[in-house]
Every structure is written in structure tokens, then in C-alpha cells.
Amino acid sequence: MTAIAKIYAREILDSRGNPTLEAEVTLENAVCGRAAVPSGASTGTKEAVELRDGDKTRYLGKGVRAAVDNVNGVIAAALVGFDGADQTGLDHRLINLDGTENKGRLGANALLGVSLATAHAVAAARKQPLWMYLSTLGESKVSLPVPMMNIINGGAHADNNVDFQEFMVLPVGFASFSEALRAGTEIFHALKSVLKGQGLSTAVGDEGGFAPDLRSNVEALDAILEAIGRAGYIAGEDVLLGLDVASSEFRDNGKYNLVGENKRLTSEQFVDFLDDWVTQYPIISIEDGLAEDDWAGWKQLTERIGHKVQLVGDDLFVTNPKVFQEGITSGIANAILIKLNQIGTLTETLESIAMAHRAQYAAIVSHRSGETEDTSIADIAVATTATQIKTGSLCRSDRVAKYNQLLRIEQALGVGARYAGRDAFVSLKS
């Protein structure tokens, strides 16, 4: 019943107007699963390869026809007849079919599209929502994650003077996901009012957050704190703050170049800088606080504030189990950001999450800046008991689609729905 009868891919557009790949897998019982692949703006050097055509006369070189052809050709030929219910076996066949360390021959976008679409198809064949089916592949428990809401965009995600890429609010002091979402939404609208009152733009960046031309990173934090209060919530109690520093983007010749603060800092000085911020503001999470190749700096940052703040590796680990294991062994960071297209298959994604749980690292399931209406990451976050999810701000349908899916899942779970809330950070001590 779950043998694969047909695999087909097409080129579609993502939220930035760039081409991406969408795959469909049809089983022998005619049930079809579909998945679309996201794309990042700031990327780690060790990420799996996203295959682009490079033809400048078409989509500015960003077409994905080659990846589509790989799905419709060599991948389909290898997988038709394979049992889609054997997700691990299917993904290993995809990996072996590509045959490279970084999935550069067929493209991680080709592999991930097929991997995810197969899971959707099998879930549909079993008349289960995706989150319920995925929970049978690993974790038996499910929970609703804390949303890390990116409400001010900077860095590579916006055209402004803010160095840091994301300023987030984390509504932890609520009993349910739906109440947490409401709080985040009210803060988002309050922030719009704050920015308008300062004569600043309320245009939004790639992930739906505002991208005002603030003079410094500190101004972004101060504006968010004002918005939290104006919305009727208490910063540090109801709502905590998170940062995606994306520091690899502004490290140059061994120095961290903060244009907004007019500073060029060594690794040690930048650790001091972040430590000061944690003291001054209710910050609970810092992502990519140091550059991906600055492991000595990461070690120092972890030893300094890792007991009281979540230190997330994104570019640092690129969802790669081998790289992640090196970080665990070295005592680097205490959380990992999970981006499916960084590694390229569902099985490897689930393996990274399981590895995080075993090492007592937090796992945060994440979108990319170039998204689609696909909501798979919401189901994955719930099914794996990941304590947090990053899926952007409270506008743009490509972001809100994931929040709406989480609302549906919460309703489906009924009295069994459990919101992670403060428990997401129970291992951190002040």
C-alpha cells in the first residue's frame, strides 16, 4: 500500500521570489504527498549544497531546473517501487545515490523535497496528520514549542544599519501555545506603534519582522522592551528576549565589526559585550554569538554564560550530526538550530534532534528566510518534542502558515496539548 508509484518535482517560487523545488510522491494506493524546500540568506559554509542552475539569463542564475531534473530522472528511477514507510531506508538510498559528503551531485534541495514528500504521503495513507506519523518514528511524546518570534530584522535579512540579524520575543509565561501566540501578536502590533511614534519605517524584512533604520543594536532592544510594556506584558516574566547575532556575517580579519556601535572587537571583547547585554536585558537565547570558525571564542562564551543563557549553534553546526558531535565533545554551545535543508533528509534531521536530546542540548526547529507555504516544520517540532520553533514574525503568510498549523495541532490534541513555556529553559540557572 505504501510502495512508491510516482515521483515528480517542479520549480516554484519562494517568499523572496526566488525559485525553489517542490516534490510530489504518489503511492501505489494513489495517495499523494507534497513538500516544498526552503532556502537561506545567511548560510553556513558546511551546509549541504543547494543546487542552483547558474544560468544568468534565467531567474538571475537561481533556477533549480537541474535539481528538478534530478528528481524526475535518477531519483525517481531509483525509488519507484520502494516502500515509502521505510523512511530511514529511503533516505539512506537518497544519500548513497548522491554519493557526496555535501549532497552536491544531486542537490540537498532535490533530496529533501523527496524525503519530506514521502513522509507526507505515508502519513496521508495512514490517515494520520504528519505530526502524529512522525512521532512514531522517534519520540513518543508530543508538545507545543515556544515560538521564537523575530520582530526586528537586521543583518542579511534587512537593508538597515542593524548588525544583528534577528531580535526575537519568546512568550514563555503562558499556559498554552494559543495564548503565547496572542501575546506575541499583540507585542508585534505594539512595536509597530512604537516605531511609527519614532518616525521610523514599519516596512518588513524577509521574515516578516520590522526593519527600521535604527542607529544601533541597543535601540532595537529598547524598542522591543517598550512594545512589551505597551502591550501589557512584563519583560523577564511573561516574555523573554532572543537574538540571532549571525556573527559570521560581520567578522572580518579576526575582528567582529559592529557598525551600529562603531566597534571592532576581538573574540574575547565580543564575549564581554554579549555578557554585558545578558546582564542588562532579559535575554534567554543567543544564536550564532560567535562566528562558525571561532571555536575558541565559542568555548569562552559557553563557559562564561552557558549556564544562564541558551547558546544556539546554527552556522556553527549546520544541522550536521558529525559537526554537532564535535561540538558536544568540545563543550561548545548548549543548543542546536535544526534546519532541514542544511542536512538534506528527514532521517538526518531527526537524528540531529535525537542527538541533542541525548546530550541535553535544546533543539530548535527552524524555517529559512526564503520560505513557502509548506508547514512541515510545525509538525516536526511537535512530533520530536523540540522545545522551541523559529518561524519568523507575525505577518507574511509564509510565516503565519506555520503558526496556524500549530494552532490546529493544539486543537487536535485537546486536553493532551502541552505547551513547553518556561520548561523549555529549565536547565538554565540564573
UniProtKB/Swiss-Prot annotation:
Cofactor: binding comment: Binds a second Mg(2+) ion via substrate during catalysis.
Binding site for (2R)-2-phosphoglycerate: 165, 339, 368-369, 390
Subcellular location: Cytoplasm; Secreted; Cell surface
Active site feature: 207 (proton donor), 339 (proton acceptor)
Keywords: Cytoplasm, Glycolysis, Lyase, Magnesium, Metal-binding, Secreted
GO molecular function term, any single one: phosphopyruvate hydratase activity
Source taxon at top rank: Bacteria
EC number assigned by the record: 4.2.1.11
UniProt: Mg(2+) binding residues: 244, 287, 314
Pathway(s) this gene product operates in, as recorded in its UniProt entry: Carbohydrate degradation; glycolysis; pyruvate from D-glyceraldehyde 3-phosphate: step 4/5
SUPFAM superfamilies: Enolase C-terminal domain-like, Enolase N-terminal domain-like
Presence of the UniProt keyword Ribosomal protein in the record: no
A Pfam family that the UniProt record links to this protein: Enolase_N
GO biological process, one term: glycolytic process
Catalytic activity: (2R)-2-phosphoglycerate = phosphoenolpyruvate + H2O
Cofactor: Mg(2+)
Complexes and interactors: Component of the RNA degradosome, a multiprotein complex involved in RNA processing and mRNA degradation.
Function of the molecule: Catalyzes the reversible conversion of 2-phosphoglycerate (2-PG) into phosphoenolpyruvate (PEP). It is essential for the degradation of carbohydrates via glycolysis.
PANTHER family, alphabetized: ENOLASE
UniProt-recorded name of the protein: Enolase
Organism whose genome encodes this protein: Xylella fastidiosa (strain 9a5c)
Organism classification: Bacteria, Pseudomonadati, Pseudomonadota, Gammaproteobacteria, Lysobacterales
